């Protein structure tokens, strides 16, 4: 099957699978990450098919919405890719990207890395920053019933994956526990440049947020 046909079938599969997904992890999130990844890949010597498929499938079954099970996503991706005849080596590569690209995985010693994963990781992290990242953070916080802000609950410097996953802190804390840390975790030059712009916007937002809280 040709590259374009594989991508077309994958887009249809992802749209159908995520049609009822939470707003910050729906098809439109996938589409933004997909476009980010293609943009970053233009300046990198990467396997574009792997980049595109991993970007499209990276949240096909996010553990946050599957009782923390980190195996469902890679398994579902493999089953679909097998069904359309994708090369087994490519499938394994994509499974590894899905399994190890998340922010929470950064708390563990790296067990897998590739240029393609770095590109998709940057693309996904960009969508957690800037105006879109702010909107997604509050959308997810509302979905989980979390407070917007509580000055009595201070941000924590999480040192392990379980502490990060189990946090129920107000959404503003999430800026300090993840979003503002992403700029320094980017892998590619393009990712770093785009991240700086979005990072700066979040700082402006927080400044205005506190002004309105305490004016």
What are these regions (language model features)?
Residues 85-121:
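Hydrophobic, well-structured mid-protein blocks that either form specific transmembrane helices
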């Amino acid at each position: 099957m040709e590259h374009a046909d594989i991508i077309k079938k994958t887009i249809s599969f992802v749209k159908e699978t995520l049609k009822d997904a939470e707003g910050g992890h729906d098809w439109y999130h996938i589409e933004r990450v997909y476009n980010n990844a293609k943009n970053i890949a233009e300046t990198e010597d990467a396997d574009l098919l792997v980049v595109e498929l991993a970007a499209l499938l990276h949240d096909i079954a996010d553990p946050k919405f599957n009782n923390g099970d980190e195996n469902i996503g890679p398994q579902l991706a493999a089953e679909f890719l097998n069904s359309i005849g994708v090369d087994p080596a490519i499938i394994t590569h994509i499974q590894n990207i899905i399994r190890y690209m998340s922010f929470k995985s950064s708390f563990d010693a790296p067990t897998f890395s590739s240029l393609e994963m770095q590109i998709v990781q940057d693309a996904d992290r960009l969508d957690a920053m800037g105006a879109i990242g702010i909107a997604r953070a509050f959308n997810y916080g509302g979905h989980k019933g979390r407070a917007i802000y509580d000055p009595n609950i201070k941000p924590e410097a999480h040192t392990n994956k379980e502490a990060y996953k189990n946090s129920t802190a107000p959404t503003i804390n999430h800026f300090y526990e993840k979003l503002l840390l992403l700029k320094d975790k980017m892998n590619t030059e393009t990712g770093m440049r785009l991240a700086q712009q979005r990072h700066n916007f979040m700082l402006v937002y927080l400044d205005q947020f506190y002004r309105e809280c305490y004016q």
